């Protein structure tokens, strides 16, 4: 989790931000989807809203993180994919306090140099996360209100090809 904090600090210091969904040209796409990425979620989250991240895992991956945050404050969902351990850690940070980490997954879906599609569905009680169309895990909301969750941050051993 310390690595994620360092990435967040770097993003803030470089003043990186964008609002995905407004990309217009391939050249702008590449610039806006560079990793580490920090983008706004217009209107915040609400039940029924879905975030889709398409990308390719790096050739020699270590880990990557996808985080949904309330600006630079609370972390509603931190999803840390670790390749050596073949695990996906999930957690939330509310008022600078990390909660209990969740690890259980039915399978590890990510493969070096292979494309993937992650869908994060915001439902009333939880986030439902699918990878390549298959349900991977649920993560029950620890941050409220949902519309305060207005930022997505992505970092690590991946290339982002599409985000909406």
Swiss-Prot record:
Keywords: Lectin. Residues 36-160 form the Galectin domain. InterPro entries: ConA-like_dom_sf, Galectin-like, Galectin_CRD. GO terms for molecular function: carbohydrate binding. It holds the Pfam family Gal-bind_lectin. Transmembrane segments: none annotated. Coiled coil: none annotated. PROSITE patterns: GALECTIN. Does not bind lactose, and may not bind carbohydrates. This is Galectin-related protein. It comes from Danio rerio (Zebrafish). The gene is lgalsl.
């Amino acid at each position: 989790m310390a690595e994620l904090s360092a990435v967040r600090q770097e993003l803030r210091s470089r003043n990186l931000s964008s609002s995905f969904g407004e990309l217009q040209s391939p050249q702008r796409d590449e610039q806006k989807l560079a990793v580490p990425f920090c983008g706004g979620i217009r209107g915040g989250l609400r039940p029924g809203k879905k975030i889709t991240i398409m990308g390719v895992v790096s050739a020699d991956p270590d880990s990557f993180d996808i985080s949904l945050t309330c600006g630079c404050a609370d972390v509603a969902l931190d999803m840390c994919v670790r390749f050596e351990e073949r695990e996906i850690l999930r957690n939330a940070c509310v008022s600078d306090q990390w909660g209990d980490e969740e690890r259980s997954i039915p399978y590890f879906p990510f493969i070096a140099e292979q494309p993937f599609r992650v869908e994060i569905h915001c439902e009333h009680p939880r986030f439902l996360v699918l990878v390549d169309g298959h349900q991977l895990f649920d993560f029950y909301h620890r941050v409220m209100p949902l519309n305060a969750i207005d930022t997505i941050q992505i970092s690590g051993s991946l290339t982002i090809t599409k985000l909406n």
